[in-house]
Amino acid sequence: MTDSKYVIIGAGISGLYTAWSLIDKGTGPSDIKVVAEFLPGDQSTLYTSPWAGGNFSLITSTDERSMKFDKFTYTNLHRIQELLGGPECGLDMLPSTEMFEQELDHAKLDSISQYLKEYRPMTKEEMPEGVVSGVKFLTWNFNCPLFLANFQKHLAAIGVTFERSKIDHISSVFSPSVDAVFNCTGIGAASLGGVKDENVFPTRGQVVVVRAPHIRENRFRWRPDSDTYVIPRPFSDGSIVMGGFFQEGNWSGNTYGYETEDILKRGLELYPEIGKRNELKIIREAAGLRPSRKGGVRIEVEHFDQVNGKDRYIVHNYGASGYGYQSGLGMANEATDMYFEAAK
């Protein structure tokens, strides 16, 4: 199937981050092939990455490993932005305000305060009724479809091969030249032969994309029973993403009018400067399936076989849920580190 040394299955954000990580550690781009059923520019419920709101937020877990992934990603994204030609690639930094109806974890606050730009806690006077803690900082914002397309374009230009193919079994991508296969299939890990991870499940989200070029700040309100957010999309002719829902186990790719209205109601309460409901220009309503996993992300090296005395490996990197953009560079870094350590 391929003469490449490394095959990455999946062309979502995790797959592209993994390709970059391999190159960053000295792999020649021509030694990498990305094989995927869906490529940047495609639209499918099973191809999650284009549908994401796409920014760095405080949504992730408070365990040490997750915080490490966040920090690595936040502090290294500027390198990818520079490679892709600057903010116009679909990756820019904008202000963010996040408000919580419960106290924030102290370990997480200690971690993010060390590296988030322009970080500061909100004062009591700044917090609306019901909010007990909040922070402001400068965050990364993605125009997800544009960023994916430009990321792929860059990788292809320097020699990475992209191939459209639906893979039924992970072993099918091994040829004599392949040293390792990186499994970045996201929600596809539930059905991929040779993997079929029963711990993988969808977390459905619905968003509303609205034209509001005057909105240049992220805003979040995290409640115990709902999460509301407004995320500007850089270099998108003024689009913002309003959400959202986190529906575990829901495989539906349909959008629902009552959910749209609920999103808009909550979003306008959170961010009234967006405008009046009857004046909003709705560009799109979309649903996506976050690739979640019981037990969290799977980053693991699995011995596959031995050819001519050389061990070959499958490297799993999936289950990022809704954290792929903001944590995925750190996840890819750990996956490639683990592979090179195993292959010594």
UniProtKB/Swiss-Prot annotation:
Q: Which Gene3D superfamilies match?
A: D-Amino Acid Oxidase, subunit A, domain 2 (3.30.9.10), NAD(P)-binding Rossmann-like Domain (3.40.50.720)
Q: What is its EC number?
A: 1.4.3.3
What does the record give as the reaction this protein catalyses?
Answer: a D-alpha-amino acid + O2 + H2O = a 2-oxocarboxylate + H2O2 + NH4(+); D-alanine + O2 + H2O = pyruvate + H2O2 + NH4(+)
Which class of enzymes does this protein belong to?
oxidoreductase
Sequence intervals crossing the membrane = none
pH-related activity info reads:
Optimum pH is 9.6.
Q: Which InterPro entries match?
A: D-amino_acid_oxidase_CS, DAO, FAD-dep_OxRdtase
- GO MF entry, a single one: D-amino-acid oxidase activity
What does the UniProt keyword field contain? Answer: FAD, Flavoprotein, Oxidoreductase, Peroxisome
Q: Does the keyword Ribonucleoprotein apply?
A: no
Cell compartments where the protein resides: Peroxisome
* Pfam families reported for this sequence: DAO
Knockout-associated phenotype: Unable to utilize D-alanine as a nitrogen source.
Residues that, per the record, bind (R)-lactate: Y229, R290
Sites where the protein binds FAD: A11, S14, S49, G53, N55, I167, R290, S321, G324, Y325, Q326
Keyword Plastid listed? The answer is: no
The entry marks the following residues as binding anthranilate, namely: Y229, R290
Query: What does this protein do, in the record's words?
Result: Catalyzes the oxidative deamination of D-amino acids with broad substrate specificity. Enables the organism to utilize D-amino acids as a source of nutrients. Enables the organism to utilize D-alanine as a source of nitrogen.
What protein name does the entry list? D-amino-acid oxidase
Source organism (scientific name): Komagataella phaffii (strain GS115 / ATCC 20864)
Which gene name belongs to this protein? DAO1
